């Protein structure tokens, strides 16, 4: 989230700093393979269950920062693959602008309503009576929502005297004003590029930093170019 210090922003800044440093030092692209180890040192992962997973994710962030596409998860390739084609004087970004690193995604559950342990199993059963679909029943003295029947109207949440029902939202999905975020068969976020306008709201709202964008000029310390004017990607690099 914006204006709040977080680990995602720290990693993002470190990736951009290293890519910018690489460019200003003359572009020794053999160093690219070492960058994930410099950004994530040591033997133990700090943010995720494995240091190898952290480095793999950072590697994809490095590629996107340099204007390179994500690598297929099912194929072996070097981190630097394709860098020669990208390191040219004139280059416009290759779509898509917003990408999902699938193995960085937490596969959050879709937006739904959930009964917490704050439920008192009251006699009034306001939530049950408020539900227009009969999706709420009582089990072991507590309310339970049948997700197959629930239409996510939120009436049960409003009716509960104990605020025991919460709306669980998938941050990226909730932030998208175009309803362009879905999920694949593994529950990972996926973007419908026919709807996506590349606003970046999903990017800044993903707590796991799984959604990233191509930011070649920003990574090199250059300002964004005016949308209404033609300019080269390399303008101002000298």
How should each PLM-predicted stretch be described?
Residues 200-209:
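Conserved glycine-bearing catalytic or ligand-binding loops at nucleotide- and phosphate-handling centers
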């Amino acid at each position: 989230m914006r204006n709040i210090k977080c680990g995602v922003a720290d990693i993002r800044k470190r990736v951009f700093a290293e890519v910018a440093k690489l460019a200003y030092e003359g572009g020794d692209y053999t160093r690219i393979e070492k960058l994930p180890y410099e950004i994530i040192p040591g033997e133990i992962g700090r943010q995720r269950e494995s240091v190898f997973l952290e480095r793999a994710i950072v590697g994809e962030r490095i590629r996107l920062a340099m204007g390179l596409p994500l690598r297929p998860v099912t194929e072996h390739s070097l981190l630097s693959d394709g860098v020669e084609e990208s390191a040219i004087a004139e280059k416009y970004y290759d779509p898509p602008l917003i990408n999902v690193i699938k193995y960085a995604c937490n596969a959050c559950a879709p937006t739904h309503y959930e009964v917490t342990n704050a439920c008192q199993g009251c006699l009034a059963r306001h939530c049950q009576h408020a539900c227009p679909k009969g999706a709420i029943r009582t089990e072991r003295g507590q309310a339970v929502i049948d997700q197959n029947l629930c239409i996510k109207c939120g009436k049960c949440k409003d009716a509960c005297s104990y605020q025991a029902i919460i709306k669980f939202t998938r941050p990226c999905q909730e932030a998208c004003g175009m309803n362009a975020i879905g999920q694949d068969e593994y529950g990972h976020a996926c973007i419908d590029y026919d709807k996506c306008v590349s606003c970046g709201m999903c990017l800044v709202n993903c707590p796991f930093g799984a959604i990233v964008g191509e930011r070649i000029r920003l990574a090199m310390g250059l300002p964004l170019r005016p949308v209404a004017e033609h300019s080269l990607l390399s303008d101002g690099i000298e």
